[in-house]
C-alpha cells in the first residue's frame, strides 16, 4: 500500500508562522493517526491488486478494472487500485498467499483456485448444483450465515485476508469438445479441463481431469494435451480462441452454476484504511456486482451468436 502526499509550496515561514504551522501540523498528525489512510497534504492511497486474468481482450480483467474504477470514483480519487494482470507479481495459484503475506494488497480471482487447499472453497463458487443460483449464494453469503463459514475456512487454509464477492455468474457451459457428446459413455477416458468440485465428480464419471490456468487451455486443446475444456462463458472463451480448436460447444451443465469473483484484501492494508475507505471497497464490490452481471447478460449472448451456427437440443432419451 502506497500513501502519497503533496509537497509544501511557498516561501520560508517566519518564526511566528513556524510555530503556528507546527501546532497545526501536530493536530493534523493526531487526526491522521486516528484515520491513517487520509494521507497528509491531500494525497491518496494506492492498493496493489493482481488479477488471475491476462490484460488486453479479457472480460474478466475488464471486470476487475470496472471494480477499480468504481473505487476511484466513489473515493473522489483518494483511494486507487493499481491493477496488474496475472503473472505480473505471482502465479494464479499464489495470489491468496501473496495477499495474506502483504506482497499484494489485493487480488481478483475465484475460490475454485484454492480448492486444492480445502474442498470447502467450492461452497463459495463451485458448489453442488440443483440448489441455489449464484445470486442466491451471494445472498446466503451476506445474510444467511455463509460469511461466517467462509471466514472459518480462510482461517483453516491459513489465508489472512478480508474477502468480498461480486459478479454472480450465469450457469456455465459444459465446454468445448473435439467430438460431439450425446451420452454419458462418450466422456469416459476423455481428458478434460475444469476446476473445483467438478474435478471429483467428473473423475468418478471416467474423465481424466486436468486443472489448467485459463491462458493454457487453448494451447492444450491445440496440442492434444486435453480433448475438451470449460473455462467460463462465450465471451471469455472466444477471447482465448477456443472456437478455433473445437467446433462442439456444449451449454447446459451442472459443474459451475453459482460462481462469483472473490476479492481478497490483506488484513493489515485493510485495517490501515479509514472506515470510509473500507466501506468503499465493500460497496464498490456490490456496485460492480450489478454492473458486471448486466454486462455479462448482453456480452455473453452477443458473442455466443457470433459462432453458434447450429443449436441442437439434447433428447431426454440421451443417457
Give residue spans per PLM region.
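N-terminal secretory/targeting leader peptides
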Residues: 2, 10-137, 149-313, 317-319
Amino acid at each position: 500500500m502506497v500513501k502519497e502526499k503533496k509537497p509544501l509550496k511557498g516561501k520560508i515561514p517566519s518564526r511566528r508562522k513556524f510555530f503556528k504551522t507546527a501546532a497545526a501540523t501536530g493536530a493534523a498528525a493526531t487526526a491522521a493517526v486516528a484515520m491513517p489512510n487520509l494521507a497528509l497534504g491531500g494525497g491518496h492511497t494506492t492498493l496493489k491488486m493482481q488479477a488471475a486474468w491476462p490484460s488486453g481482450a479479457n472480460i474478466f480483467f475488464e471486470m476487475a478494472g470496472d471494480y477499480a474504477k468504481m473505487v476511484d470514483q466513489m473515493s473522489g480519487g483518494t483511494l486507487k487500485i493499481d491493477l496488474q494482470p496475472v503473472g505480473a507479481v505471482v502465479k494464479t495459484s499464489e495470489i491468496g498467499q501473496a495477499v495474506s503475506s502483504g506482497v499484494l494488497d489485493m487480488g481478483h480471482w475465484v475460490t475454485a483456485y484454492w480448492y486444492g487447499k480445502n474442498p470447502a472453497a467450492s461452497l463459495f463458487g463451485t458448489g453442488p448444483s440443483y440448489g441455489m443460483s449464484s445470486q442466491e449464494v451471494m445472498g446466503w453469503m451476506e445474510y444467511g450465515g455463509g460469511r461466517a463459514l467462509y471466514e472459518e475456512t480462510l482461517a483453516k487454509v491459513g489465508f489472512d485476508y478480508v474477502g468480498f464477492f461480486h459478479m454472480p455468474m450465469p450457469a456455465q457451459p459444459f465446454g468445448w469438445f473435439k467430438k460431439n457428446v450425446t451420452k454419458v459413455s462418450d466422456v469416459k477416458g476423455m481428458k478434460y479441463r475444469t476446476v473445483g468440485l467438478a474435478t471429483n465428480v467428473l473423475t468418478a464419471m471416467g474423465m481424466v481431469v486436468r486443472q489448467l490456468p485459463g491462458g493454457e487451455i487453448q494451447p492444450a486443446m491445440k496440442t492434444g494435451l486435453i480433448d475438451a475444456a470449460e473455462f467460463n462463458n462465450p465471451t471469455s472463451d472466444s477471447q482465448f480462441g477456443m472456437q478455433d480448436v473445437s467446433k462442439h460447444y456444449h451449454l447446459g451443465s451442472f459443474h459451475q452454476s453459482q460462481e462469483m469473483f472473490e476479492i481478497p484484501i490483506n488484513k493489515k492494508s485493510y485495517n490501515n484504511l479509514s472506515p470510509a475507505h473500507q466501506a468503499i471497497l465493500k460497496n464498490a464490490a456490490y456496485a460492480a456486482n450489478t454492473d458486471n452481471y448486466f454486462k455479462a447478460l448482453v456480452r455473453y449472448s452477443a458473442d455466443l451468436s457470433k459462432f453458434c451456427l447450429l443449436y441442437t437440443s439434447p433428447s431426454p432419451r440421451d443417457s
